UniProtKB/Swiss-Prot annotation:
It comes from the Bacteria. SUPFAM superfamilies: ATPase domain of HSP90 chaperone/DNA topoisomerase II/histidine kinase. Its EC number is 2.7.11.1. It catalyses: L-seryl-[protein] + ATP = O-phospho-L-seryl-[protein] + ADP + H(+); L-threonyl-[protein] + ATP = O-phospho-L-threonyl-[protein] + ADP + H(+). Gene3D superfamilies: Histidine kinase-like ATPase, C-terminal domain. The keyword Kinase applies. This is Anti-sigma F factor. Keywords: ATP-binding, Kinase, Nucleotide-binding, Serine/threonine-protein kinase, Sporulation, Transferase. GO terms for biological process: asexual sporulation; negative regulation of DNA-templated transcription; negative regulation of sporulation resulting in formation of a cellular spore; sporulation resulting in formation of a cellular spore. It comes from Bacillus cereus (strain ATCC 14579 / DSM 31 / CCUG 7414 / JCM 2152 / NBRC 15305 / NCIMB 9373 / NCTC 2599 / NRRL B-3711). Belongs to the anti-sigma-factor family. GO terms for molecular function: ATP binding; protein serine kinase activity; protein serine/threonine kinase activity; sigma factor antagonist activity. InterPro entries: Anti-sigma-factor_SerPK (IPR050267), Anti-sigma_F (IPR010194), HATPase_C_sf (IPR036890).
Length: 146
């Protein structure tokens, strides 16, 4: 059975933890393992933080959009912003690359997403924002997360 949820919120850093927990609660109905759930929460955190810090450059008037689609043992996440976009996507996806070293950013966001998810697609246009599509296939091991 397919189930879908959408969420939008102001681009405030304090909303990142809400987004992470909110998505995890929705995904729990598929009964992921604790490891899978932790990986998804981490990926949501990374993508939302990127949207807030890099996409909107801390402008709280921006809106972050998240959708989740659940189908059988598959989770599809989309995190989108309408910020400044990524100027060099290949460079941004390199481990340890950051445009905000003064904020003590590690530059590992995309690397984490690529390691924790089965599919990662990033679409970005300068001045029009960034959309990240993430897919995770769950082990369906009846982990009793519910």
């Amino acid at each position: 059975m397919r189930n879908e949820m959408n969420l939008q919120f102001s681009a405030l850093s304090q909303n990142e933890s809400f987004a992470r927990v909110h998505r995890a609660a929705f995904i729990a109905q598929l009964d992921p393992t604790m490891e899978e759930l932790t990986e998804i929460k981490t990926v949501v955190s990374e993508a939302v933080t990127n949207a807030i810090i890099h996409g909107y450059e801390g402008n709280a008037e921006g809106i972050v959009y998240i959708s989740v689609i659940l189908e059988e043992a598959m989770v599809k996440l989309t995190i989108r912003d309408e910020g400044i976009g990524i100027f060099n996507l290949d460079e941004a996806r390199q481990p340890l690359f950051t445009t905000k070293p003064e904020l003590e950013r590690s530059g590992m966001g995309f690397t984490i997403m690529e390691n924790f998810m089965d599919e990662v697609e990033v679409i970005s246009n300068e001045s029009f924002g960034t959309t990240i599509h993430l897919t995770k296939y769950l082990s369906n091991s009846n982990a009793l997360c519910n």
